[in-house]
A protein has these predicted regions:
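Rossmann-like NAD(P)(H) cofactor-binding subdomain of soluble oxidoreductases
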Residues: 102-174
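Structural motif
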Residues: 5, 92-93, 132
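Internal alpha-helical scaffold of NAD(P)-dependent oxidoreductase catalytic cores
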Residues: 150-171, 175-212
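NAD(P)+-binding Rossmann beta1-loop-alpha1 motif at the extreme N-terminus of oxidoreductases
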Residues: 1-58
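Local beta-strand N-terminus motif with an aromatic residue
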Residues: 90-91, 130, 188
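A structured beta-alpha segment of the ubiquitous adenosine-cofactor-binding alpha/beta core
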Residues: 61-93, 99-102, 124
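Redox-cofactor binding/interface segments in oxidoreductases and associated redox assembly factors
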Residues: 94-96, 135, 193
Length: 212
């Protein structure tokens, strides 16, 4: 069976570790997914992409299991990185791991959604019908219904597609910094939901492959 292609958008620590967890997922001792990590085409993004493609985890970590799992994924050839977002066009699954920044205006915390919304717009311009989009970023309540769905719908409509043509789900990042970082992804229960039942079911199948 051909491996499904998963794009992980956002190669911060969470995104890089999640990409690793997905890449080491196996069924019948064979990798389930081909994984492509995507980051911004800027100095920081290019540094992360280059490190990954050279076989180096892009962050310092004392989790030896994460380091070895990353090396294993690189050796087996199903984990790479790029700044070219067009690779999303033939993805089966897209994971959004973009950090939301908080600015303090007049001492009131305000979320900066621009980078997040820009990424969702680009996804809508690129993805094929039936793609599963999982928002893993920790977002405020209502973000999927009030930001993600309308943004995707606007871009899809320009392409003559309906929002019903894609599967939208949310499963917030659940990680524990330290020497068991990877295990905090793969060995703990995960909460998830879908915009439709079909999306929720697809998300459950994916998470069941990644989480022990």
């Amino acid at each position: 069976m051909d491996k499904q292609k998963v794009c992980v958008i956002g190669l911060g620590f969470v995104g890089s570790a999640m990409a690793t967890a997905i890449a080491i997922s196996k069924s019948n001792n064979r990798p389930v997914y081909d994984v492509v990590g995507i980051d911004l085409d800027n100095k920081q993004g290019n540094e992360r992409v280059n490190l990954i493609n050279c076989g180096e985890f892009p962050f310092s970590t004392n989790d030896n299991h994460l380091k070895s799992a990353f090396k294993h994924a690189i050796r087996q050839g199903n984990l790479k990185a790029t700044t070219d977002k067009s690779v999303c066009s033939d993805a089966d699954i897209i994971i959004v791991d973009i950090q939301l920044d908080i600015d303090y205006l007049n001492n009131e915390p305000q979320l900066e959604f621009d980078q997040f919304k820009n990424a969702i717009s680009e996804i809508g311009r690129l993805i094929a019908p039936e793609t599963l989009v999982i928002i893993e970023t920790t977002v405020p309540p209502g973000t999927c219904e009030k930001v993600v769905v309308p943004t995707l719908e606007s871009e899809l409509n320009l392409r003559g597609l309906s929002i019903d043509n894609v599967l939208i789900a949310h499963s917030y990042e659940r990680v524990m910094p330290g020497n068991e970082y990877l295990a905090s992804i793969t060995d703990y229960w995960r909460v998830f939901s879908g915009y439709t039942k079909i999306a929720a079911d697809a998300c459950e199948v994916f998470l069941s492959n990644v989480i022990n």
